[in-house]
Swiss-Prot record:
It comes from Mycobacterium tuberculosis (strain ATCC 25618 / H37Rv). Pathway: Cofactor biosynthesis; molybdopterin biosynthesis. It comes from the Bacteria. SUPFAM superfamilies: MoeA C-terminal domain-like, MoeA N-terminal region -like, Molybdenum cofactor biosynthesis proteins. Signal peptide: none annotated. One of its GO terms (cellular component) is cytoplasm. CDD domains: MoeA. Pfam families: MoCF_biosynth (PF00994), MoeA_C (PF03454), MoeA_N (PF03453). It catalyses: adenylyl-molybdopterin + molybdate = Mo-molybdopterin + AMP + H(+). Its cofactor is Mg(2+). This is Molybdopterin molybdenumtransferase 1. One of its GO terms (molecular function) is molybdopterin molybdotransferase activity. The lineage of its organism: Bacteria, Bacillati, Actinomycetota, Actinomycetes, Mycobacteriales.
Length: 426
């Protein structure tokens, strides 16, 4: 029986990242940046107001409002016995204004947030520090040089790296790329994943199952798991186990996908037909892996391009767990990720856990956090391993997989275990 780590290593060796492509930044979210994005211009590109108010020379308003009683006189204003200054307002500069004006000594210009500052202005008075006047403004408090001013290049200077290679592009990175004027960016594309299910008992959810028939769960669930892993998914759906039809469909998918997943090809009536067809397309190895659920599984590289192809159990829970442990890391490696596995934390068990002897367990669980101590706690879901691997409802409730080491058949309440986050937590 092969260990989980040995099987993962064999699969990882087959990972090939598709050639990077250049895409519009609106399409880059969730992908890994494949270049160092170097800025060509400063951001912001000019000195601008950081708040609605009045652009002034800081020297003209120095001391106004100080408790020390410093009085400042202006040629166009009077001091009314308090530390208050009146300045003439020489117009308004709106955000987006393209004509630069020049501020004269002892003057103010009303500005909007984001508006370019007039020449010589080095501070902005917020409206709350004034009386809000339109032609003349009473200054109630002075401002030092640089107050409420965004200087050109404060955020990014020419030659700075805005987004580094290897960064997963999210909303903030898309915004930064737009801010520095990049329309397109080089990324590692999503690997194309084809998902199909084999089994004479399967019927699509659009039809009513007859006696002995069950809905096709796997092609839908595994396609969703592929999208969660950031693959570009083609859900083929139910495929006949007729050798001719099966061979044509699989061969067609090998020509258009970087990864192929077939559920239902490792046991039961369909197994022999599936393996016979796949053996004509390349090398497919079906082995027992020391894990539970999903011990029996297959992996090979098929077609002229050696496309990584997986055979997963027909049991939906087992299929999803094998996808999580074996298929997902390959997809993440193909995206260019250096650390393709889910985040692992240590958690204290809230109930006893039973695993299968001699196998590494991946058991469904509910992870929570103690509000006082911050400690992770985990509640195992489902019953005994042999009787609960088919219970899809408990997997839908789970937000983690409890990883039970090989040889640890019994875990007592209060013991510490490793827990892998699932989709809701990253």
């Amino acid at each position: 029986m092969r260990s989980v780590e040995e099987q993962q290593a064999r699969i990882s060796a087959a990972a090939v990242a598709p050639r990077p492509i250049r895409v519009a930044i609106a399409e880059a979210q969730g992908l890994m940046c494949a270049e160092e994005v170097v800025t060509e211009r400063p951001m912001p590109g000019f000195d601008q107001a950081a708040i609605d108010g009045y652009a002034v020379r800081s020297v003209d308003v120095a001391g106004v409002g100080d408790t020390g009683g410093v009085q400042v006189f202006a040629d166009h204003g009077d001091l009314d016995g308090r530390d208050v200054l009146t300045l003439p307002v020489m117009g308004t500069i709106e955000a987006g204004a393209r004509t630069l004006s020049r501020l004269q000594p002892r003057q103010a210009v009303r500005v909007q947030t984001g508006a370019p500052l007039p020449t010589l202005a080095d501070a902005v008075l917020p409206l709350r520090w004034t009386d809000g006047g339109m032609s003349r403004v009473r200054v109630l408090r002075g401002a030092p040089s640089g107050a409420y001013v965004r200087r050109a290049g404060d955020d990014v200077q020419p030659g700075d790296v805005a987004v580094r290679a290897g960064t997963i592009i999210g909303a903030a990175q898309v915004g930064l790329l737009a801010a520095v004027g990049r329309e397109r960016v080089l990324v590692h594309p999503r690997p194309r994943l084809s998902v199909m299910a084999v089994g004479g008992e399967l019927v699509d959810i659009s039809r009513t199952p007859g006696n002995g028939q069950v809905y096709d769960v796997n092609s839908y669930a595994l396609a969703a798991a592929g999208r969660d892993a950031c693959a570009e998914v083609n859900r083929v759906g139910i495929v006949s186990n007729d050798p001719t039809e099966l061979g044509e469909i699989v061969e067609g998918q090998l020509n258009r996908a970087e990864v192929v997943v077939i559920a239902g090809g490792v046991g039961g009536a369909a197994a022999e037909a599936v393996r016979s067809v796949l053996s004509e397309l390349g090398e497919m190895e079906v082995v027992r892996v020391a894990m539970h659920p999903g011990s029996v599984q297959g992996f090979g590289q098929l077609g002229r391009d050696g496309v990584p192809t997986f055979l997963l159990p027909a049991n939906p829970v087992s299929a999803l767990v094998v996808f999580e442990v074996m298929v997902r890391p390959l997809i993440r490696l193909s995206l260019g990720k250096r650390h393709p596995m889910r985040r692992i934390v240590s958690a204290r068990t809230l109930s006893p856990i039973t695993s299968v002897a001699g196998r590494k367990g991946y058991l469904r669980g509910q992870l929570m956090r103690d509000q006082d101590s911050g400690e992770y706690l985990v509640q195992a879901l489902g019953g005994a391993p042999g009787a609960s691997s088919h219970l899809l409802a408990t997997l839908a409730e789970a937000n983690c997989l409890v990883v039970v080491p090989t040889g640890a058949e019994q875990i007592r309440t209060g013991e510490i275990v490793d827990v892998a986050f699932l989709a809701q937590h990253g």
